Amino acid sequence: MIVRALVLGLSLELLPPSSTPFANTSNCFDFVALTPMQAMKSLSELHRAKKIILGGAPISAPMEALLQEIPTEIYATYGMTETVSHIALRPIAPKERHSMVYTTIGESRVWQDEQGCLVIHCPEVAEGEIHTHDVVRLHGAHAFEWLGRLDNIINSAGVKIYPEGVERKLSSFISDRFFIWKEPDALLGERVILLVEGREADYPHLLENLQKETVFSKYELPKKIYFLPHFQLTASDKIQREATAKLLL
């Protein structure tokens, strides 16, 4: 934010790190950068910002629905270490502008490699091409829809399943941490499974409730649910999918 303020000629207000940053100030702002958690804990205060960018963690479907009701311009960001800052934005709010498509900013251009992964040309910050492991659906040279990580794809009966997309659909049904993974299947090759950090007793009818939903394809629907007391996490509190799945062995 310091660099952004210097480039754009903005005045900064310095606040202590907090999950509820608006609680430490009574001011209104032109531009604010938040994590999804900070946004969720500040829903009643987001109207104090004209524009908000969100990054650093996934945005669940229920969270996105709540954010669409805020009278503020809110954008999801796409970027990585190699691009220094975000290179694309996706509008979340107001509701009439909501889209699942990211649009590049500046001189950035995008295309796909042979595996369907995003390749970025961002001359302002990097020389040459930046190859990612993010599988996307292109909408021209300056727009794309993010589908998931190449490393996580599940091949079930020849159908490619993107766990991140399934997780987005599941986020309305599960209040604890969870993720989609795979296990070998004699008929399908790989089948979708669901891992939940919590107690089975708290979700007595979860599988049968999911089977009644029409938002899942027959291959996306988890074939089995596993409950674990604790997931393996990184130092930044992100789920280590493969390490956690190994706990089932």
Q: What is each model feature region?
A:
Residues 133-220:
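AMP-binding/adenylate-forming catalytic core of the ANL superfamily
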Residues 193-197, 212-249:
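Conserved C-terminal "lid"/linker of ANL adenylate-forming enzymes
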Residues 1-41:
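AMP-binding/adenylate-forming
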Residues 46-95:
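Gly/Ser/Thr-rich phosphate-binding loop
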Residues 31-33, 53, 195:
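Structural motif
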Residues 109-137, 142:
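AMP-binding/adenylate-forming core of the ANL superfamily
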Residues 75-82, 101-103, 181-184:
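Beta-strand->loop->alpha-helix junctions that form or flank phosphate-binding loops
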Residues 30-31, 50, 134:
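Conserved acidic residues
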